[in-house]
A protein has these predicted regions:
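Non-catalytic interaction/regulatory segments
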Residues: 1-160
Length: 160
């Protein structure tokens, strides 16, 4: 599956509303097929439930390959991290070439640094991603840890 667009809203009382626009090569041309969509929904619910039941750290990701198009027209990866609301929350903006598993790698890196996502806007345009996150966490309050987070995120988005 590929995530074309996502919006993530997290409340202070640990509730989340996440919406994803997903495509699947297996469903190409069948998005108006109710049976195919029901199958996709069942599969995704089972995968989410399995992940919730595991209650363990996120597994290592298998790095996806860049497409020929992304290799032919490379994009300079970019990360911007800006404080908002008296440094309580931070806006993280990432621009990079897309590849399978990239969003997962970003999420895993944020988790490893103890960062929680309060709001996210995930956009995929062809081979390019423009993702914006509103994040918070102890690591953001210390410049050295903030720099390490940015370095780790850059390593994720810059690797092919």
């Amino acid at each position: 599956y590929s995530i074309l667009d996502a919006r993530i809203h997290t409340s202070r009382d640990a509730h989340a509303l996440d919406t994803f626009q997903v495509i699947s090569p297996r469903l190409a041309g069948q998005y108006d097929n109710a049976r195919a969509l029901a199958c996709l929904e069942t599969h995704m619910q089972a995968a989410l439930q399995q992940a919730l039941d595991a209650d363990s750290p996120l597994p290592a990701v298998q790095r996806g390959r860049l497409s020929r198009r992304a290799k032919s027209f490379p994009m300079e990866p970019h990360i911007q991290l800006d404080a908002e609301e008296k440094n309580a929350r931070w806006r993280l903006t990432i621009h990079a070439s897309d590849r399978p598993g990239l969003l997962y790698q970003i999420a895993r890196t944020l988790t490893q640094h103890g960062i929680s996502v309060q709001l996210a806007k995930i956009s995929t345009m062809g081979e390019r991603v423009e993702d914006t996150f509103l994040i918070e966490g102890e690591a953001l309050q210390r410049p050295q840890l903030r720099d390490q987070l940015q370095q780790d995120l850059f390593a994720v988005i810059a690797s092919a």
